[in-house]
UniProtKB/Swiss-Prot annotation:
Coiled coil: none annotated. This is Uncharacterized protein MG371. SUPFAM superfamilies: DHH phosphoesterases. Pfam families: DHH, DHHA1. It comes from the Bacteria. InterPro entries: DDH_dom, DHH_sf, DHHA1_dom, Oligoribo/pAp-PDE_c-di-AMP_PDE. Belongs to the mgp1/MG371 family. Disulfide bonds: none annotated. GO terms for molecular function: nucleic acid binding. It comes from Mycoplasma genitalium (strain ATCC 33530 / DSM 19775 / NCTC 10195 / G37).
Length: 324
């Protein structure tokens, strides 16, 4: 069994027993790891502390993947509840990315995250980038607090793990990831239901995937990139723009791949970078971003900044190729 700082477990367990109200927070544009971690912890509270109340903030009336799996909130949560609650923030590396920003109203805050630490913004934090997913952290936390995993908790954690590890393909997958996954499977949860919720997409989204792939360019140094035009997603019936960086996965000869799209709500260009084994988070940090060693995101004010980033990464690959 993996070891977690015993002082954190002791202090966190005290907080769980002390508070009767919990507001659970995820990052903007929440993915399966964020929602999986939050809903798994909500289910843990409902199972072992049925008298307590917990809500996943921002999941009410949201357009996001996972509606077939996660029981999104049916009502909005008022500020008075948050003010009396322990806020737990999942899978969020910096404060400005917390969905709703209402964690600032909470009586106390806890943050649990597997991204590299960039800032401290909660009263209590457990940050460990050796984990493949925040969902993996939550699974081990529940176990080391002395509780069991049930099939509902397991299904949510599994969704978070398989997406953040890219079905265990990614370099962040470790023996401890497989060890926890084995424990999840022992609960007998319905894997087919999770797989369908995560991977089945409408035909139009598949066409959008093909569109992004058709726009990709590949340099002789092994960089693939695609700039997605403003509003392109609307032609495919997609509800909101997506980074679609996975459209460039698994292309032979490609070492780094990146995409960028225009986010109409914040009026900025949002991009993602991926690689198999080359650290790329430093490139994202140059352009108002960051993330994991092999998976990162960035934010641009102007579209032409994307080509500057592309040039920087391509020059890096050119030098690397010369030295190999």
């Amino acid at each position: 069994m993996i070891s977690i700082d015993p002082q954190f477990i002791k202090n966190f367990s005290k907080k769980v027993k002390q508070f009767d109200k919990f507001s659970l927070f995820v990052h903007v544009n929440p993915d399966f790891d964020a929602f999986g971690s939050a809903f798994a912890f909500k289910t843990f509270l409902n199972t072992f502390f049925s008298e307590k109340k917990a809500y996943v903030m921002g999941s009410y009336n949201i357009n996001a993947d996972g509606r077939e799996l996660f029981p999104f909130e049916q009502t909005d949560i008022n500020d008075d509840f948050v003010k009396e609650s322990l806020a737990i923030i999942f899978d969020t590396s910096n404060q400005e990315r917390v969905l709703t920003q209402k964690h600032k109203l909470a009586k106390e805050t806890v943050r649990i995250d597997h991204h590299p630490r960039t800032e401290k913004f909660a009263d209590m934090e457990w940050i460990d980038s050796s984990f493949s997913a925040t969902a993996e952290m939550i699974g081990y936390l529940i176990l080391q607090m002395g509780y069991k995993l049930n099939d509902e908790i397991a299904s949510y954690l599994y969704a978070g793990i398989i997406t953040d590890t890219q079905r265990f393909w990614g370099p962040t997958t470790t023996p401890q990831t497989f060890a926890l996954t084995a424990k999840l499977m022992e609960t007998g949860f319905n894997r087919n239901k999770v797989h369908d919720a995560v991977y089945l997409k409408p035909l139009l989204e598949h066409k959008y995937f093909s569109y992004v792939l058709s726009k990709a360019k590949i340099t002789k140094n092994g960089l693939a990139y695609a700039l997605i035009k403003k509003g392109a997603y609307k032609h495919f019936g997609v509800v909101s723009p997506l980074p679609m960086v996975h459209a460039l996965n698994n292309i032979k000869g490609v070492k780094i791949w990146t995409t960028v799209y225009f986010n109409e709500s914040i009026k900025k260009w949002i991009g993602s970078i991926r690689s198999r084994n080359i650290p790329i988070n430093n490139f994202a940090q140059m352009f108002n971003g960051g993330g994991h060693k092999y998976a990162a995101a960035f934010v641009l004010d102007e579209k032409n900044q994307f080509m500057k980033l592309v040039q920087i990464m391509d020059d890096f690959l050119a030098k690397q190729n010369e030295n190999s």
